[in-house]
Amino acid sequence: MTSEQETSQTNRLEQASPCAIATKGLTKTLGSTKVVDQVSLEVPTSSIYGFLGPNGSGKTTTIRMLLGLVAPDAGEVEILGASEPKHRQLRLSRVGAVVEGPGFYPYLSGFDNLKRFAQIAFPAQRKANPTIMKLSGAEISSRLEQVGLLDAKNKAYRAYSLGMKQRLAIAAALLWQRDLLVLDEPTNGLDPQGIVEVRDLLTSLNQSGLTIFISSHILSEVEIICSDVGIMRDGRLMFQGSTKAFRSSFGEEFIVETADPGLAKSVLLQFGFAEPDSIQIQAKRLTATLTTDEIERVVAALVNGGVGIRAVARSSPSLEDAFVALTGRSGHAR
């Protein structure tokens, strides 16, 4: 089969798949410990997917298997629609990744670092995909512009802020055309300004059609930018779906401000809109987990029941609240 035929076949596979990453029963044992156990990921194309889990949950090993750095003991990996090893290698040439801390030369400029990186990486890129060409200086400058570093292209790497260094690493991962970007802790160690810079960059890249897979422990950032999440615990995938669905799965609270919360409770129980143990009353506020999504019916029943309503609100748990409820771990995910 010629390289053009291989490219055509993997393109057809990609078009048939709604997922940029799909695994089935992915399993890996290190020593006597099963660190990844029957993990089946589905990362929607064009999504920003947050991959979360406590320390030792198997995230890093999973990422290494996705990128072909570690061989699984069992299971299947499909990247950009290609599952067979030969085709997957070709598709991996369309995947950019920043898994370890970026290794750049401190006294070289951002431009010269990317130029050097492109020279070193080109043979492997060309071997995986014969259609890939060497990059010109203008193309390297274009990548720097893409990550907002064009004005700093001649500044030495050692003079870059942490946020700038991370953006340069992302530029290196995007030197050639990519359909998928895999990032391990992209905002780790950054100050608030650096976090905002990287967040804005990832949002912009995603809007251009790039699928982004992020492993992160900063849950507040994941909640802001990720459309989908996967939650790992003890090597198993405990949840996978939209960020909104994950939060909602742990209950959405219905809040009523009223002068008579006792009457409001009676009405909710009368119509079966809430279970008794889900209702809490504090001063003039009633909070309940409803058994229905039809808020209009609930409000109408309260009004018809004589409840004087001052305010009504709905509140979903934060991503961190839901994460703690699922994993039993407080603080940062790892």
Model regions and ranges:
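ABC transporter nucleotide-binding domains
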Residues: 18-23, 28-214, 219-233, 239
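Short low-complexity, flexible loop/linker segments enriched in glycine and/or proline
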Residues: 230, 325-328
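Short amphipathic beta-strand starts and helix->beta connectors
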Residues: 237-242, 270-274
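Short acidic-hydrophobic catalytic motif
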Residues: 244-248
